[in-house]
Amino acid sequence: MIRHKYLFPQSLPRLAVLLGLLFITSVSGYAQSKPSAGKSANAISAIRESDIKRDLFALAGDHFRGREGGSLDELKASVWIAEQLRAIGLQPAGDDGTFFQFFHIQRTRITETSRLNIGSHQLTHGEDAFILAPAIASVDAPLVFVGTGTPDDLAKVDIKGKAVALAFSGTGPPELSYRRFLFGTMNRKAAELIKAGAVAVVWVSDAQAQSYFERWTTGLERGRYDLPGGPNTRIFSQAPTVWLPASALEWVKQPGQQFTNVVNVESFSYPSVNIVAKVPGTDPTLKNEHILFSTHQDHDGVRRAVAGDSIWNGADDNASGCVATMALARAFVQKPAKRSALFVFHGAEERGLLGSRYYVDKPTVPRESIVAVLNAEMIGRNAPDSACILGQQPPHRNSADLVNAALTANTLTGMTFKLDTLWDKPDHPEGWYFRSDHLPYARVNIPAIAFTSLLHVDYHTPKDEPERIDTSKVTNITRWMYLTGWDIANRPQRPAIDKGFKLER
């Protein structure tokens, strides 16, 4: 069964009124706060840790409830950001003279009417079992347990027409990469078993996988997201893959059990939004070109409580990038560059880079006028002097000019960061280059890099709180981004695209 719903929250009309009022004040506010010319070569002194800390605790506090993409909380946080930009003195650069560019995201999930039974155990998706993909299924078959699924284990059992249960086993990479190893292994092995004749696959966690069952399965509850018509909106039928906790192992082993699974799928449409603002350039010709400072305002919202905390605030991911981008805006307002500075806070990044994908497809300035993208993604954790540029080395580097500008600027702030290069390599298990908002721009040959301080143990957990952020580090990375952008924004020539640039996937 497929159900389609078009969801616009009942309180959205009140939000629309607020947005309208903000549009009115944005125009008048900009007229009253035009950037001053200033006398300094740049305005790096406008980037202050006190501003960054204040904004961080506001945006990543419980008031905005984790800013989940497609929710009223994301919209409320977006209005707050736009109001800060108006007060700073930026010009609205979204649709229809506002700070906003609205778009729709489509969500596909497993319905509450879906049923899952193994023997006498009635299981609920999202609680004591998780179905890995929201696909239509109807299975009623004998369950066979095949140990850890080794060739020797499988040789002893006829799996054709059966639901196959197996215990997860295998030592993966370190914790920060284990999640991708876990899901990759489960999906790959399940595909092999289904190809060999299994009609369903049931995974039971081992001790290491169990911690991820408890921490990372909230995304499976949500389902899949995409822009309308995107690949994740397609609803299809397939043999189900089920994930169980380690506590299920003893009863799953029992012989003679029946596996019954009826999966129904439903689809929803939600509003999300990009926030777009600019500081016009001062050069009569170059002001028609833009250097784009990119970030995203959404996170994971309200989810299953961990240690009593159900609000996943996303202080590092990515309130840190947002407050940095606001600080960059203050500097460009104080001292405009020759080229225009464009600031884009992308919505629904956590749902699959949806806001940046939408903006690249429907930019509010001519796409060819964007000379470079500097993306801020998680810049507030780990060692104070460590950082990473995504897009620094081939095949991810698409502009040596832009990368060299960033490397030079790294030596000019008084805090020279030691740059990690491993996470930008194509064989890194996290595939970090492909997971932030610079990517859609790079795919259309716009010079693009991302500044990041990389993952940490609180990534996508309720422990990603503002109290854990190194605001001094955020300030220093912001100044580094500023000097890079200031350089590019004032050069006579725009940075060139590397000849033959092609991503590995």
Indicate where each model-derived feature is located:
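N-terminal hydrophobic or amphipathic helices/low-complexity stretches enriched
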Residues: 31-92, 154, 215, 288-290, ...
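Bacterial N-terminal signal peptides
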Residues: 14-26
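Metal-dependent peptidase/peptidase-like ectodomains
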Residues: 122-124, 239-251, 337, 346-450
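His/Asp/Glu-rich mid-to-C-terminal helical/loop segments that flank catalytic regions of hydrolases
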Residues: 330, 334, 339, 456-505
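Noncatalytic luminal/extracellular "stalk/propeptide" segments of secretory-pathway proteins
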Residues: 65-175, 405
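Zn-dependent metallopeptidase/amidohydrolase metal-coordination segment
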Residues: 294, 301, 428-477
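Soluble metallo-hydrolase cores and metallopeptidase-like ectodomains found primarily
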Residues: 35-40, 114, 121-157, 227-314, ...
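Extracellular/luminal Protease-associated
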Residues: 125-231, 280
